[in-house]
Amino acid sequence: AQDSCSHRCGELLGTCSCQATCQSLGICCPDYKEFCLQISPYSGSLMGGKDFLIENTAFNASSVITCRFKQKIKTRGYVAKDGKAHCISPLLYETGFIPFEVSADDGLMFPYSGTWLSVHHNKVSDAEKCTLVNETKWQYYGTPNTDGNLTLTWTQQTLATTHINIEVWGYQETGDSYSENWLAEWTYLYTLAREIPNTGKFSFIPVPAKGNYSTWDFGILRITPSNYSDGQRQIYFWAFFFSSNIPSIWSSEHALAWHLGKDFRNDPAAWATAKCIEWDRKEEKLPNFIEEIIDCPCTLAQARADTGRFHTDYGCDIEKGSVCTYHPGAVHCVRAVQASRQFGAGQQCCYDSAGTQILTRDSTGGSTPDRGHDWGSPPFMKPPRIPGFSHWLYDVVSFYYCCLWSDNCHVYMKRRPSSDCRTYRPPHAASAFGDPHFFTFDGLNFTFKGQGEYTLVESDLTSLRVQGRTQQARFPNGTQAQVTSLSAVAMQENSSDVIEVRYSQDLNLEVLLNQKVISFSEQSWMDLKGLFLHSTADQNITVMFSSGSGVEIRGSGGFLTLTVLLPEKFMNHTQGLFGVMNGHIEDEYTFKNKTTLSVHASPQELFEFGANWAVENGTSLFTYDTEFLLDNFFYGEKHNASFLPVFFPYEDPADPLVTEMVLVCDSDPFCRFDVLTTRSLQVGSSTRLAHQNHKLLVESLKPVISCGWLDHPTNGQKNGTKYLLGSTISFTCDQGYELTGSKERICQVTGAWSGDTPSC
């Protein structure tokens, strides 16, 4: 009998395949599309309640659909009039791709399978959430000068129903901090409005919540069709966890000022002060996470260049007009991508318009570290690693208590002081671009135009591997040129997911996750195994591995540009075309057997060096999902020894292209080289830009010396908030006091301040 994909998606069977690559290779089992599910939409908030369609499988109208996530969380599905099945996503305490299966016989067998992308609650589109109109009013309700109506709006088409309920849910974490019994829980509290028309708008005058509900100060609203019972989510059925999730629209999570009790409304500042002091006492007993988090980059330039370890904080983004509500005076903030190892804590770094780091000791606009990383951290599921909500509980609600609802911000800043940058070490960068020109970690550059698949960098420190494929470039008229360009890059670290970025044959940029092409149409950010993946609107792809290493890939006209960023700990732990990262260029051209070539080697000798780093089928990370790739790269040679490139292109003064080339390239040798070998000014122009970007990156990543923060003397002032090499801080005393010690101190090359501590 022919093999079947029932229960077998992702496997290669005896006679056919149930893997994603089977479609382009034409080797799928006949029932591949029936059992291996395509869904739309493919992502939704971790809060659940999102209806998604199973596109490729038809079911009987009488089928009883059950959807099961992670092999244990079950939700009810249904068959629509068109015969297509739908599932409802469950409440999950994690982000990332979640495997799910579908049963059509009320849960006896689950032969169908697919994956659902669970995302951070702030990363779903606005249309999927209901909007707290004038959100500040909701979060300050009951404080002086904030009263009257509150309004909620939503997209009414999202729920196919005439009447809705609006529920209030609260979030809490119970048990002992940092212990096995520390648990996260969303709880249905009460129904705010029942059976109201689904018009897309609701206004009300809030009253303090009844009973002990008003003790919940952090939560969320949920809109559901009114034909379900209140708060319906889970029914415990024997030993099975059967969750009857229902279609829902959630609001953004927020401080529940508007439903707090009379004690809050009568004297909000006193109530908040008591809460702030209580939080401070709790923090006193918790372990110090600040010693564990990475230091901030010293300058805005470093922060924006270190893309493997830091990513834009969407709450303060220079590319979106610097709307920095929580950080007055800042123009840009970044967050450390990885949570700290033991405590799952997060780092944040903010900068002013001069590019200088803003510290909380100087300004309330300073950056504050987080006991709970805002994005959560693997393995999720338990505090302090719950995406978004753990962070709200320890770092945001407490900010409301101390800074926004009362005047005790000094208490908050004492527990969340900015880290300075004295221990920050910038990463080292290597790049490849154009008709491949390579810039190594130690700053050597060379051109290697082999055709094949090569190890760009590998490291024994974290089993990091980045591999590049080069293909023959084409002239503008379509014929093949005697040069190559980078057409695909594949990478993995330890046992992480494998990411590949490549140009397809029709020159579309594709990103593959474990051999499957993925779409960024709904989500530009993905939390994956061992890495984060980000794509900008113009297809700049960034991979951030858990070690802090980063890979950036951009495409232009069939040529890939690649940058790899490695933190200092990779020193003396790299090999491949990008060289041995150790600060010396003499050993850049090191072969697999550890012999080296002179740095003055000829292009022909460098061709030998490059060929030595060809990958083997056993260690290749690439996906071979077309006849062309199989023939040329899988069954063919990994390094095409018969392909001989142009080593020295001829510059003919009578060639009209040369005149134009000078205008485009100026004196850039790589640009000139690529124009002559590809006959394309556009390729030359992209090469020049990539070369300039690399030089700029290396410049931005130069180490900066910091002498650390200086305090003002008691009964005196200080002038200046820059603490980097060459900065001067001057001191004066209040009237009636005299200064002893240094009037001004300068940050010296040793990392120490000149002079002595002043006092008044």
Question: What positions do the PLM features span?
Answer:
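Short, disulfide-bonded extracellular cysteine-rich repeat modules
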Residues: S17, Q23-C36, G344-C350, M413-T423, ...
